Swiss-Prot record:
Family assignment from sequence similarity: Belongs to the glutamate 5-kinase family.
Protein name: Glutamate 5-kinase
A biological-process GO annotation: L-proline biosynthetic process
Signal sequence residues: none
InterPro entries referenced in this protein's UniProt entry, alphabetically: AceGlu_kinase-like_sf, Asp/Glu/Uridylate_kinase, G5K_ProB, Glu/AcGlu_kinase, Glu_5kinase, Glu_5kinase/COase_Synthase, Glutamate_5-kinase_CS, PUA
Residues that bind substrate: 58, 145, 157
Amino acid sequence: MRSPHRDAIRTARGLVVKVGTTALTTPSGMFDAGRLAGLAEAVERRMKAGSDVVIVSSGAIAAGIEPLGLSRRPKDLATKQAAASVGQVALVNSWSAAFARYGRTVGQVLLTAHDISMRVQHTNAQRTLDRLRALHAVAIVNENDTVATNEIRFGDNDRLSALVAHLVGADALVLLSDIDGLYDCDPRKTADATFIPEVSGPADLDGVVAGRSSHLGTGGMASKVAAALLAADAGVPVLLAPAADAATALADASVGTVFAARPARLSARRFWVRYAAEATGALTLDAGAVRAVVRQRRSLLAAGITAVSGRFCGGDVVELRAPDAAMVARGVVAYDASELATMVGRSTSELPGELRRPVVHADDLVAVSAKQAKQV
């Protein structure tokens, strides 16, 4: 299969490769260092061809099962985190040993959703990853499951890999798992499931039924599709391919499903506002303000706000909601929640001089469609 979108992945200089738990485990769920070594070989070939590669690797919990004497993947949070703390050591050591065969050094980068959402930590993570690549080390990124809580069900690093792809300015994202690509329904349950080789936008997914989780990891097809759409919307093409065909996927992108990138890449700040930042509050708007913000791309003024919720400070990201509570945009708010509560519904001329700035400036505001809202 050839297409301009596959060619973009085949020729990408900067690449993020996400390796799912099922790509690193046996059918019984035990960590398999041999499978990891095979994936490292495929990545090495791509790097020898001139690409810079960052790896987002799942598998820490699976790698901790055997050393802790467990018979299966744990279900409770405390044991998952204990397994992750032990397994992360085994996981990064396995990557280190695999790349040592090629004379390469690896660096471990553990992140949480909170790290990505906070602007300072976000920037520090970006600098660390950029510096590792400049020093020709292979960055191995994983979610820090040991301290994560709800994020431990983040989607088996699918969403994290999409965020990292934009963070490092990657030219493409490759998601490797135990699946051939995208089908209109689960091919393991439906014999006549139709394979979808290319997705040009969310409209191509109408009628597609995606499973929510795998039995070994936490990321099912729904998680992978959401991550692929997120990255593609940010301007990064995505290939969803089977880990068994990793060599082919990384060599010429002729397998799996490709998700086409939007023509114009989102700026780092607008991407952070739309997808990465954690919203600490919400502003409910009247219908006129919704039109001004979404259709006319104008700044939000206090007069168009009908309600304020949450605790936030000036500089935080908040959700902007329509009268029916649907999120229509996200933006950087200029005032603390306590200040804003006194401004609701008031025209600019009624406010004191120090409170006449827009509540959310147009430059710090990103409209969000209904489908994008599900990816946030």
